[in-house]
């Protein structure tokens, strides 16, 4: 019989992969808490309109990648392809637009139908941070600083470069869009098929092209910096000043536009050279219209998301897990005492496992297999004396001690 396999583009996260995944989440959760973020959990599926209307009808995610289906009531629902839209929906649904700003951390699975490749899956996992209700560029810098600190504490920050850009406000984007279309229209016949479509529907997305010839044409294209109105230029200058105050290095990259249509002003990506062409490990930007599009009042916001699988791949080593203590009763008569000792150790925060089966040799082999740091041996003589034998497995040293002293001996 053929063994069942996970669906293409999905994976089982177990063993070393699970430890790496857990380490990324716990590090991000702890650092986000230092910035005042509260953790939210939103549903993994939403009404399709939450994504289709708000991510941009021309975005690749909406046009090509969403897992959308009708439920048994005929309602169109979609497995979430990203986290920001759901968080903004939750803010409005729960009446939290009057208690701003809100800083939100989230983590969990996302779903996109795209070609699986290194570090990219159809079910993947993200961590994310949103700061909603803050209109100042300092909020953008603080969100970026949080992302930078997470990368640093994971030990991967030194190999990653922060790229920033501004998309300006609506007036600035309109002026830039006109200049960009005027320029690219002269070379329309040379553009890739995808960029020809984008030239009509969403010209700024051409800046995100991966086509080599498109990139060549863009080298001489107008830059948005020349089309910013005073307010947008001041916002961008404020962002750069705040990043410098945080001690965060960055490069300006006029091609950073991100994949969703809800962004304005700030767009940024942390890029690694260790993951090939798809090198972005954390990215985001400002979205000042998204909450209003969800039915809430005009509410500014800024945030980012990062792929857990991709960050886990960058870790230099698998995080160590606490080495347990193996509790080994020599016979059935000692099992009750073994259970009592297991309970005592675990309540004291010491990882402990029991080795019940086989002879003493097999039980010690199991203790070594689970990488136990010590074994607590309980025989009939020790039981009668209210004692145990503590064996240190790295060096084989052992000694008898009263049960009452076991916790202190194990530290």
Swiss-Prot record:
It holds the Pfam family HGTP_anticodon. Its EC number is 6.1.1.21. It is found in: Cytoplasm. It comes from the Bacteria. One of its GO terms (cellular component) is cytoplasm. GO terms for molecular function: ATP binding; histidine-tRNA ligase activity. Transmembrane segments: none annotated. Belongs to the class-II aminoacyl-tRNA synthetase family. Homodimer. HAMAP family: His_tRNA_synth. This is Histidine--tRNA ligase. It comes from Acidiphilium cryptum (strain JF-5).
